A protein has these predicted regions:
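Conserved phosphate/oxyanion-binding catalytic-loop motifs
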Residues: 74, 79-97, 230, 372-381
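Single conserved hydrophobic/aromatic residue that forms the stacking wall/gate
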Residues: 1-9, 14
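Structural signal for terminal/edge beta-strands and the immediately following C-terminal loop/tail
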Residues: 333-335, 358, 362, 395-424
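Short glycine/threonine-rich catalytic loop with a Thr-x-Gly-x-Asp
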Residues: 10-11, 160-161, 223-232, 302-309, ...
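C-terminal structural cap/anchor segments
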Residues: 295-359
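Flexible glycine-/small-residue-enriched beta->alpha junction loops
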Residues: 84-97, 115-169
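Self-splicing inteins and homing endonuclease
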Residues: 5, 42, 50-79, 128-154, ...
Length: 424
């Protein structure tokens, strides 16, 4: 079988599309997925006056030459912000170009506290003023032209770093961001901005230097394949089926992901920029050199992305051996393991951050059942578990999966899965 991993993650597309607010000229972005989070963000940009042209599937041109700042202050816009976490990414480009931004506390995944301090403190250091309306739950941000400065971020926040970068590119003078996130998502945003005329150096490191320019111009950009989707399909192929090829994965941007799966005993074979995951009747978890059982934990890039821990946990349920999954960066992403325990998985939830998985070594199949998807990544993990389980499973709240995976049921059905979308 072959499945083409040529799509992108919602976060990356959202940041890149917001960067189009920094210029009045057209910016063309290719490889945009048809997923709900991205579609909602594009509609939000259209609502504020950005002209969006769909050239072909996944190929859009954005032109922000008639942005309606009055709409940005409207209750309708602010109500939209509460339902879409990506709305916070409008702050950086809007305050940089227009000197004004308003945003309500955004929505998104229910995976614990996701504070906005890094965004706000960084943009404040550039000279912006923040007023918070407690009654409406709205931030009113305003500034003259921002001024470059040195800042040491309190956390290597991906969205916070992106927002500060976009605010800095039009600031006077030089901005230095230390402890910046350096994920491929951030690298690609910086490359896009440089093609638009920005002056950003230190890309791929945690120390970025941004020399402000007077204006940006149009550019063309192709977004990277989504490494989380690639990892999800690796996990799926390990659990069930006769093996798959995943095409055009941008291997050099996968980081530690293939190695992490290999520590669970999963074979990930590279052929150029493609991956092949063979059929796995058996796979065994490594142990550390001193004989202690394996621990997998998330960390800021180039460490393991937290978005794949849910998938790795499910894969471990059918491995031979024991692994500790340690979710350090969020505090509520492991609660979905109760549903896996109901399916017959051997998991001990130690606390909100740690779970011990004792694998079945493919000797005992999971049982199908009813479950609810709490967030994007737990949703795809439960779907993988259901595909490998004995019997029929029913997953509700699949809108969460739709937020991050394009046409997931039709793509998996093409690989031989039996998945049907039903109305409840």
């Amino acid at each position: 079988y072959e499945i083409c991993a040529c799509l992108v993650g919602s976060e990356m597309c959202i940041r890149d599309s917001c960067a189009t607010l920094l210029t009045s000229e057209p910016v063309r972005i290719k490889n945009i997925p048809d997923i709900s989070d991205v579609n909602n963000q594009i509609r939000l940009l259209e609502d504020v006056g950005v002209k969006v042209t769909r050239n072909a599937p996944g190929d859009f041109t954005f032109q922000a030459d008639e942005v309606n700042m009055e709409y940005v202050q409207s209750d309708e816009f602010l109500a939209r912000c509460t339902k879409l976490r990506g709305s916070v990414m409008l702050i950086g480009p809007m305050i940089a170009r227009f000197g004004r931004a308003m945003v309500a506390k955004p929505g998104g995944d229910k995976i614990g506290r996701r504070r906005l301090d890094t965004h706000f403190l960084g943009i404040q250091k550039l000279g912006a003023k923040f007023d918070y309306d407690i009654r409406r739950g709205v931030y009113d941000i305003h500034a003259g032209r921002l001024c470059g400065t040195y800042m040491l971020l309190d956390e290597a926040s991906v969205t916070g770093t992106a927002n500060i970068i976009m605010a800095s590119v039009l600031a006077m003078g030089t901005t230095t961001i230390y402890n910046a996130a350096c994920e491929p998502y951030i690298q690609q945003l910086c490359h896009l901005l440089n093609r638009m005329g920005a002056n950003i150096s230190g890309i791929a490191s945690n120390l970025l230097t941004i020399v402000g320019v007077d204006s940006l111009h149009g550019a063309a950009h192709t977004v990277l394949p989504d490494m989380i989707e690639v990892g999800s399909f690796i996990g799926m192929a390990a659990m069930v089926g006769d093996g798959i090829s995943i095409k055009n994965v941008s291997y050099d941007n996968l980081g530690i992901i293939p190695y992490t799966f290999s520590r669970l005993g999963v074979q990930v074979l590279r052929h150029g920029d493609d991956l092949f995951i063979p059929r796995h009747d058996h796979y065994e978890i490594d142990s550390f050199l001193d004989g202690s059982f394996m621990t997998l934990s998330d960390a800021p890039w180039p460490g393991l992305t937290p978005d794949l821990l849910s998938v790795l946990l499910v894969v471990a349920t059918q491995a031979k051996g024991t692994v500790l999954i340690h979710q350090k960066m969020f505090e509520s992403r492991l609660f979905f393991v109760d549903k896996l325990i109901d399916m017959g998985a051997q998991i001990i939830l130690c606390d909100p951050h740690r779970a011990v998985v004792v694998g079945h070594d493919h000797q005992i199949r999971l049982r199908g059942g009813r479950m609810t998807s709490p967030d994007i990544r737990a949703g795809i993990a439960l779907l993988i578990a259901a595909m490998s389980a004995d019997g029929t499973s029913r997953i509700s709240n699949i809108e969460q999966i739709d937020r991050g995976y394009e046409n997931i049921e039709s793509r998996l059905t093409a690989l031989g899965a039996c998945i049907k979308r039903v109305e409840e």
